[in-house]
Amino acid sequence: MYSENPIKRRASTRIYVGDVPIGDGAPIAVQSMTNTLTTDVDATVAQIRALENVGADIVRVSVPTMDAAEAFKLIKQQSNIPLIADIHFDYRIALKVAEYGVDCLRINPGNIGNEERIRSVVECARDKNIPIRIGINGGSLEKDLMDKYKEPTPEALLESAMRHVDILDRLNFDQFKVSVKASDVFLAVEAYRLLAKQIVQPLHLGITEAGGARSGSVKSAVGLGMLLAEGIGDTLRVSLAADPVEEIKVGFDILKSLRIRSRGINFIACPSCSRQEFDVISTVNELERRLEDIVTPMDVSIIGCVVNGPGEALVSDIGLTGGARKSGYFDDGVRQKERFDNDNIVDSLEAKIRAKASIINGRIPAQDINK
């Protein structure tokens, strides 16, 4: 597979969220946010584990009350991946979750009280080596900025972000990342472009309130893809009105499409037409379902006829080209003598893909796959 990647990442400082490096060339981290009641510890822990199982690097948890902070303590004790506490208005909640081992605080320094309260949170974060995310959102800009700009604009988002950055700068705190999210793609993209020129800290990307699973995925892919292709972004969240697990899957698919970071199988499949020799759509859907557990990066082409099939197979780890009654099978671009019965394609291909993943991971000798 042609894999030249012309993207030059924006230079930034590095912070750590738990043991996950962010910025300075580190792999772009994919995160999501729980949508359970935080006080429902069992449900929240279960969702965090589900997110971990599909590859989430970091999970954010809303902590709106002191009761939620006490629940967070229990949640943190049962979680294996770094957790960010999302906090607004009450600085005491930030101090409390810091005691309980939070890995990052998502706050806006300007909305948690006066300078003394801000200082107490920042000093606590410094003492406990906890980074902060400044999270600016087009839907919650300060009143004076709305009066000045009349509506959310890239310049308004930038000005809001720089206010909060300046607060941390005055307190000599540099362990932070920043986001300037908006629900409009062009608004968010331009705000991030402006911010990327102003600061050296890592940037967390997101198109906020993007929509449902389909429309939100498309909007996020367009917006985040534009920024990532320009080298902007160190961590991301795809915000969907859907199961948070889908956010992680879409996030990795975006990174995979740009060949920035790969996890699991990259399926190359034709949309099918009357030339197809087997049911391509049902085959791909079933294989995606069966092979969700595979994290090994690999390219698998599934093409229903010989027009494009051999060409795609030549640049795939595993390739399938439709043929009458039996379909051709390629391994590392080499056509194999073995052919698959079209009535048993899914089972046959699943076995080959799993064997290939084991070879790539070094668990079985290469010659064993085609015996």
Curated annotation (Swiss-Prot):
It comes from the Bacteria. [4Fe-4S] cluster binds at C270, C273, C305, E312. It holds the Pfam family GcpE. Keywords: 4Fe-4S, Iron, Iron-sulfur, Isoprene biosynthesis, Metal-binding, Oxidoreductase. Its EC number is 1.17.7.3. InterPro entries: Dihydropteroate_synth-like_sf, IspG_bac, IspG_bac-typ, NO2/SO3_Rdtase_4Fe4S_sf. Binds 1 [4Fe-4S] cluster. Pathway: Isoprenoid biosynthesis; isopentenyl diphosphate biosynthesis via DXP pathway; isopentenyl diphosphate from 1-deoxy-D-xylulose 5-phosphate: step 5/6. GO terms for biological process: isopentenyl diphosphate biosynthetic process, methylerythritol 4-phosphate pathway; terpenoid biosynthetic process. Gene3D superfamilies: Dihydropteroate synthase-like, Sulfite Reductase Hemoprotein, domain 1. Its cofactor is [4Fe-4S] cluster. It catalyses: (2E)-4-hydroxy-3-methylbut-2-enyl diphosphate + oxidized [flavodoxin] + H2O + 2 H(+) = 2-C-methyl-D-erythritol 2,4-cyclic diphosphate + reduced [flavodoxin]. GO terms for molecular function: 4 iron, 4 sulfur cluster binding; 4-hydroxy-3-methylbut-2-en-1-yl diphosphate synthase activity (ferredoxin); 4-hydroxy-3-methylbut-2-enyl-diphosphate synthase activity (flavodoxin); iron ion binding. PANTHER family: 4-HYDROXY-3-METHYLBUT-2-EN-1-YL DIPHOSPHATE SYNTHASE, 4-HYDROXY-3-METHYLBUT-2-EN-1-YL DIPHOSPHATE SYNTHASE (FERREDOXIN), CHLOROPLASTIC. NCBIfam families: ispG_gcpE (TIGR00612), PRK00366.1 (NF001540). Converts 2C-methyl-D-erythritol 2,4-cyclodiphosphate (ME-2,4cPP) into 1-hydroxy-2-methyl-2-(E)-butenyl 4-diphosphate. Belongs to the IspG family. This is 4-hydroxy-3-methylbut-2-en-1-yl diphosphate synthase (flavodoxin). It comes from Shewanella sediminis (strain HAW-EB3).
